[in-house]
Amino acid sequence: MATFMTEDFLLKNDIARTLYHKYAAPMPIYDFHCHLSPQEIADDRRFDNLGQIWLEGDHYKWRALRSAGVDESLITGKETSDYEKYMAWANTVPKTLGNPLYHWTHLELRRPFGITGTLFGPDTAESIWTQCNEKLATPAFSARGIMQQMNVRMVGTTDDPIDSLEYHRQIAADDSIDIEVAPSWRPDKVFKIELDGFVDYLGKLEAAADVSITRFDDLRQALTRRLDHFAACGCLASDHGIETLRFAPVPDDAQLDAILGKRLAGETLSELEIAQFTTAVLVWLGRQYAARGWVMQLHIGAIRNNNTRMFRLLGPDTGFDSIGDNNISWALSRLLDSMDVTNELPKTILYCLNPRDNEVLATMIGNFQGPGIAGKVQFGSGWWFNDQKDGMLRQLEQLSQMGLLSQFVGMLTDSRSFLSYTRHEYFRRILCNLLGQWAQDGEIPDDEAMLSRMVQDICFNNAQRYFTIK
């Protein structure tokens, strides 16, 4: 019987163990998409206790707590202490067997806290609380201290076009910080013209860009100014959360002006008008990214804020999102082609939340590759509900079967937690085990030089090259 979570966790043969321990584990982390707070990095936040750093803002854990019947006051309540929330989590973790949270929890205790050989639960919670809190009181366990322990080389935060990026500038000016912290442009509120807050948001964009927006060209001018601001602060990428992927041929400016005017006047837009406006903004933005050498990321297929009662109580990003099932292939093809037809398609990473769309993306990327940039269009790693063992394996296998796994830019945390870097370890173990199994079965050569180069490229080198090449 195998022992739970040894140093060889998930590594089933000698080839896999060699690939992981000798080549994957030492590689730095290039975490090109996350939701960390740049202010917390700039301020080098110190955490009061394990409950705070572990549970604050982590909607993966919040969903598990709710599924275990825990009262909301012990999940997001302001009236309960960090310790009370922590003990609720300790009582819940033994119930998460089979869920990646069980693995992640114990990986996070191993690194950076060094707690091994102990199962987390109500019987061990007090001892672990004390041990971890003692370490959190030291400089090595500040926000940046943890990042340095985990060998993080770069993080890409997620930032709204109206953000000042003051903390990114503060970080860049601080010679004591040797981690690159790059903003990523997230313009969801710009192209989602159908949302209730669209008009109010345009007012904020006007103020940030110092441009009055009444016509579509005004919007272009405002966005150009903000794109320039992001570029000056070291932006390398954009990101777009797309629940429903729409496409319509882009109309002329007169029609776009009319659509925008209707929305500003409070009138209801038709589905066609929404699709026309959304497509126009995305295609124009994509061309701007291409000109700047940025990467365009499209996260497709979430249904967000499903629970109206809890949305009214807690707001967005609190654990009430799930997988959508809209068809995406035709609209995605047309959207990418609208940029590529003028040779203005940027480097692009496509992510799907519904795993049934894996093959759609794995084949779509082959339509739009280009010379000079290996893997110009990427099928991104298993996202959100898919960043678990089966989801990662599906993505790796389908990419390898329909594209070039060797050119893959690898894993990202997509997380709000400074303890989530062990997800890179989880991914690397799964990757090495997959290659090790193929080699053991004679499906690929047992060639250490060839396999080790591929592992190191996927773990770090490919992403570093991809995001920095113009």
UniProtKB/Swiss-Prot annotation:
Pfam family of the protein (one): UxaC
Keyword Ubl conjugation included in the entry's annotation: no
Organism field: Salmonella heidelberg (strain SL476)
GO biological process, one term: D-galacturonate catabolic process
Record keywords, A-Z: Isomerase
Protein name: Uronate isomerase
Catalytic activity: D-glucuronate = D-fructuronate; aldehydo-D-galacturonate = keto-D-tagaturonate
Keyword Isomerase: yes
Family: Belongs to the metallo-dependent hydrolases superfamily. Uronate isomerase family.
Pathway(s) of this molecule: Carbohydrate metabolism; pentose and glucuronate interconversion
